[in-house]
Amino acid sequence: MVKYMKIVGITDLHGKLPPAVREFKDFADVLVVCGDITHFGKGIEVIEKLAELSDYMEVLCVPGNCDTKEVIDELNSFKLNIDRKVKKIENINFVGIGGSNKTPFNTPNEYTEEEIYNKLINVVKNLKNIFLVSHAPPYNTMADIVDLDKDIHVGSKSIRKIIEDFNENIRFCACGHIHESRCIDKIGNTIVVNPSPKSYFVYDTKKNMVVLDDFNGF
């Protein structure tokens, strides 16, 4: 019998773990962290704090574009990193894709769209019931707008293409990267959520329903 879950998601910590995250253990089954866990390596001790929470719930992370190789190694040492990996929990396949598409800022963990596509397609192509944990948001959604007045989209076109091509199999895409684009959106059947640094989401797999809450209201 499938156990329904509550999945909580956060993103863009930049080395600071909101105190409320420790309370997630009281109700969450899985915590996903969508990258930029540190600020170019600063605040790396936050990874150990996340690892401590894995005694109470599954903790699944991907690195962001601002996370260095040292950060990735630290995530691996605590077995939290699901970048380009699959972690099956109950009937859901959690798939991670870390880093971002190219930015103007030459950050440590950026890739071409071709690289992103090749990294992700090889993981998702034979899977069903996928929960995608991505740092970069899919292109042309409410999750990737950098200037809310000018409607400029900067997300990954490869991630969007894969969501479109495997729309029946990808039920959810949790992402971050663009701090100002806090949203719940959809691409076809796929729920897309960017909680932004100031919020977290809770996804109820039984109801197939997601809500966003501010940390200051916890």
UniProtKB/Swiss-Prot annotation:
Q: Which domain of life is it from?
A: Archaea
Question: Which Cys-Cys disulphide bridges does the record give?
Answer: none
- SUPFAM superfamilies referenced in this protein's UniProt entry, alphabetically: Metallo-dependent phosphatases
Which InterPro entries does this UniProt record tie to the protein? Calcineurin-like_PHP_ApaH, Metallo-depent_PP-like, PAE1087_MPP
Give GO terms: molecular function aspect only.
Answer: hydrolase activity
Which CDD domains does the protein's record reference?
MPP_PAE1087 (cd07392)
Which PANTHER family did the record assign?
CALCINEURIN-LIKE PHOSPHOESTERASE DOMAIN-CONTAINING PROTEIN (PTHR37523:SF1), METALLOPHOSPHOESTERASE (PTHR37523)
List the protein's name.
Uncharacterized protein MJ1162
